Amino acid sequence: MAFTFKQFHIDDLNCGMPVSTDGVILGAWAPLAEAKNILDIGAGSGLLSLMAAQRSQGQITAVELEEKAAAACRYNMTQSPWAKRCQLVHGDIQSVCQLAQYQGYFDHIICNPPYFEHGPKASEQHRAMARHTETLGFTPLLDAISQCLSFEGYASLILPIQSLARFKACLNDTALYLVREVWVKSVENKAANRALLLLSKTEVEPYQRTDLTIRGEDGNYTEQMIELTKDFYLKL
């Protein structure tokens, strides 16, 4: 399936995870404007990488393990206005983080991690790889962030609410701090089902916890959502 944004186009036909509202929200929310070196872990089709390229002047490094997704990511990067600032690394993030040139190198890391911790696997192997934490669990993900993030850098993620407690338990075993958290509601007056998280190597006070509602009771995007995503969605 192809998806056209205001400044770039995504072809995600061969990716395990297609373009999603989760990814768009994360890419629009992450504080990327001042970042000079940005790492996209588990890049998939390259959506977050290209959103980061649009929102910053930084160099983008995308890491993707699955072969078909990596090919789609590379293609989407080369077709974008920011091809010269984007590079794809086809491999696993643990190996990438062992490379000396990447340790402590990135001032922003962005990731929409796999989120099915339990339950039946997807039927196609590449889709299952994208959605199951056994490919990249929270502990190795946080280890990779710790290795690659600069001391003054930030990491932005989005997770299902039901995974939040387990993620925070893993976070407690690292030298990373949760400095900002946004609970995301799909519809007004419904319980939040996603959380945007901002991590840092330095503790920030006061800790911030806010809310974002995607749609009102009338089914239309809220003013919050419009303001957040207006630079990307064609009809906003």
Swiss-Prot record:
Report the subcellular localization: Cytoplasm
On whether S-adenosyl-L-methionine is a keyword of this UniProt record, the answer is yes
What CDD domains does the annotation carry? AdoMet_MTases
Q: Chief subcellular site?
A: cytoplasm
Q: Name one GO cellular component term.
A: cytoplasm
- Please give the catalytic activity noted in the UniProt record: adenosine(37) in tRNA1(Val) + S-adenosyl-L-methionine = N(6)-methyladenosine(37) in tRNA1(Val) + S-adenosyl-L-homocysteine + H(+)
Q: Name one GO biological process term.
A: methylation
One matching Pfam family: MTS
Which segments cross the bilayer?
A: none
Q: What is its EC number?
A: 2.1.1.223
Per the entry, what this protein does is: Specifically methylates the adenine in position 37 of tRNA(1)(Val) (anticodon cmo5UAC).
The UniProt similarity line reads: Belongs to the methyltransferase superfamily. tRNA (adenine-N(6)-)-methyltransferase family.
Its protein name is: tRNA1(Val) (adenine(37)-N6)-methyltransferase
The organism is Shewanella sp. (strain MR-4)
What does UniProt list as this organism's lineage?
Answer: Bacteria, Pseudomonadati, Pseudomonadota, Gammaproteobacteria, Alteromonadales
